[in-house]
Amino acid sequence: MPLSLTLRLQLNLEQITALYNFGQFQYTYGNYSGAADYLYHFRVLSTDVDLNTSAHWGKLASDILTGKWDVALEELNTLRETLDARAGAAPAGAAAHTHAHAEPLATLHSRAWLVHWSLFVYFNHPAGRTLLLETFLAPAYLNTIQSAAPWVLRYLAVSAVLSRRAQTGGPTAPVSSRVRHAIREVVKVVQLEEYQYSDPVTKFLKELYVEFDFEAAQHQLQLAERVVGNDFFLSEFREEFLDNARYLISEAYCRIHQRIDIAYVVLCPTSRA
């Protein structure tokens, strides 16, 4: 318990707060490893909810900037759990009336920031794309994306395509139903949110799975190749994205045609796609 540990170490509130301030100072001049250490120890000792949340953000930023992706993922998960717990805690008495409108907006704002910051982790950690699907397809975060950050649908769509193999699951690599049905769920969202956001990546999925227009899907894939290749988070996944997208075209074509043009299927992964 932080209180018993504080008493045992004989630390007062001013000394504990100094850890936060010094961690903030370390971050300001670029010593991100030092900042992460000070903010971590501050969190262990502090009982100030708001400062602890701020320290979470600071440590996550520090872990991202030092490229410690396993540590950053752990911090991201901890921060998400903290935000979700605060969102689920209903205030009582007069506070419930006063903050009835402010709390949902603050929660939306915090989750929107988390969604954006998480892109650094999810597109650098080896298991990041599957973990992105787990988080972004959860109702609370999908609602956040739809309400405050529809452009994040690009990253959701790319992750669904990149995680094609993971969606098949298996005895050695079981996956959740959320990941297993990711493409189907993403297509629904893409179709629903088309009025406020679309790009060649989302259009590719729509043409392939909603319109069943394979020529249009291939055209959008050509455009998506440029979009993915120029995107800060996605550029290194360009070839993997194309390979998986071409497979999805062939798979969809074979599913809906009783007679299959073998030349089409064979050529699709190379020249035609």
Label every PLM stretch briefly.
Residues M1-A273:
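Extended alpha-helical scaffold regions
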